[in-house]
């Protein structure tokens, strides 16, 4: 196993522990708490994949971080922070909408790279909007936290989420996953549109109804894909 992979996991475990202690003091905001919860799932998945104990990794990560801080001057820290581009966290959904449990009458699921696409194919003839919480850097989607499909009544009928055991995805990965989700929902004559935030950062152009400009041939292909593979 690559030593960098192990040490990276150890540092991530310790930094998560620090953030958890901060949250336990009731000082974290909603985006902070949301990232904390999702990173916990990711660490568990990575630990299982690597065969490493999280508690042991956390202790090792603490030693690595302490060694770095001991060698780091305040001036070097300021320069490092200034040189790193800042990402923004954008929220279409409330914390309640993100954490709400939902159930499917006709569950369908597809794994596309490091993203999991789920939907209820019992939903028909509904107006549906896609909402997402994600980070943005350089005016492009950086990391998807969670995307969900809502009916006008507020029911959740679809979802795209990163797989904890396979971290890392691009904005193109997210765009393709959204296309698959839209194709699957439209197969049952639902009308799907995306939020203004997703329009701005996931696509550079969209139709008047808030849809990405998928041609009819691509829409049919996506619908067949979700029907046959999900």
UniProtKB/Swiss-Prot annotation:
Region (Disordered): 205-230
Subunit relationships: Homodimer. Interacts with host TRIM25 (via coiled coil); this interaction specifically inhibits TRIM25 multimerization and TRIM25-mediated RIGI CARD ubiquitination. Interacts with human EIF2AK2/PKR, CPSF4, IVNS1ABP and PABPN1.
UniProt short sequence motif Nuclear export signal, positions renumbered to this chain: 137-146
Listed name of the protein: Non-structural protein 1
Keywords: Eukaryotic host gene expression shutoff by virus, Host cytoplasm, Host gene expression shutoff by virus, Host mRNA suppression by virus, Host nucleus, Host-virus interaction, Inhibition of host innate immune response by virus, Inhibition of host interferon signaling pathway by virus, Inhibition of host PKR by virus, Inhibition of host pre-mRNA processing by virus, Inhibition of host RIG-I by virus, Inhibition of host RLR pathway by virus, Interferon antiviral system evasion, RNA-binding, Ubl conjugation, Viral immunoevasion
Motif (Nuclear localization signal): 34-38
Keyword Acetylation: no
UniProt note: domains: The dsRNA-binding region is required for suppression of RNA silencing.
Segments for region (CPSF4-binding): 180-215
Annotated family: Belongs to the influenza A viruses NS1 family.
GO biological process: symbiont-mediated suppression of host cytoplasmic pattern recognition receptor signaling pathway via inhibition of RIG-I activity; symbiont-mediated suppression of host gene expression; symbiont-mediated suppression of host mRNA processing; symbiont-mediated suppression of host PKR/eIFalpha signaling; symbiont-mediated suppression of host type I interferon-mediated signaling pathway
Entry-linked Pfam families: Flu_NS1
One MF term in the entry's GO annotations: RNA binding
RNA-binding and homodimerization as annotated region, ranges: 1-73
Disulfide bond residue pairs: none
The record's account of how the chain is modified after translation: Upon interferon induction, ISGylated via host HERC5; this results in the impairment of NS1 interaction with RNA targets due to its inability to form homodimers and to interact with host EIF2AK2/PKR.
Job of this protein: Inhibits post-transcriptional processing of cellular pre-mRNA, by binding and inhibiting two cellular proteins that are required for the 3'-end processing of cellular pre-mRNAs: the 30 kDa cleavage and polyadenylation specificity factor/CPSF4 and the poly(A)-binding protein 2/PABPN1. In turn, unprocessed 3' end pre-mRNAs accumulate in the host nucleus and are no longer exported to the cytoplasm. Cellular protein synthesis is thereby shut off very early after virus infection.
Lineage top rank: taxon: Viruses
Gene: NS
One Gene Ontology cellular component annotation held by this UniProt entry: host cell cytoplasm
Listed InterPro entries: NS1, NS1A, NS1A_effect_dom-like_sf, uS15_NS1_RNA-bd_sf
Span list, region PABPN1-binding: 223-230
Protein's UniProt keywords contain RNA-binding: yes
SUPFAM superfamilies xref list: Ns1 effector domain-like, S15/NS1 RNA-binding domain
């Amino acid at each position: 196993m690559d030593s960098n992979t192990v040490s990276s996991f150890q540092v991530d475990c310790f930094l998560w522990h620090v953030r958890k202690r901060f949250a336990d003091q009731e000082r974290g905001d909603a985006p902070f708490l949301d990232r904390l919860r999702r990173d916990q799932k990711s660490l568990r998945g990575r630990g299982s994949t690597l065969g490493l104990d999280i508690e042991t990794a956390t202790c090792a990560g603490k030693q690595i971080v302490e060694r770095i801080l001991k060698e780091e001057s305040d001036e070097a820290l300021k320069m490092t922070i200034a040189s790193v581009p800042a990402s923004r966290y954008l929220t279409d959904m409330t914390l309640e909408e993100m954490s709400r449990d939902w159930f499917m009458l006709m569950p369908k699921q597809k794994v596309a790279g490091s993203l999991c696409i789920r939907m209820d194919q019992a939903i028909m003839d509904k107006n549906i909007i896609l909402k997402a919480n994600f980070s943005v850097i350089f005016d492009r989607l950086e990391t998807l936290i969670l995307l969900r499909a809502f009916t006008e009544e507020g029911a959740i009928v679809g979802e795209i989420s990163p797989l904890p055991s396979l971290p890392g995805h691009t904005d193109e990965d997210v765009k393709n996953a959204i296309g698959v989700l839209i194709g699957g929902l439209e197969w049952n004559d639902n009308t799907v549109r995306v939020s203004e935030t997703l329009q701005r950062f996931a696509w550079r152009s969209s139709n008047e109804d808030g849809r990405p400009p998928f041609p009819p041939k691509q829409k049919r292909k996506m619908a067949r894909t979700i029907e046959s593979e999900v």
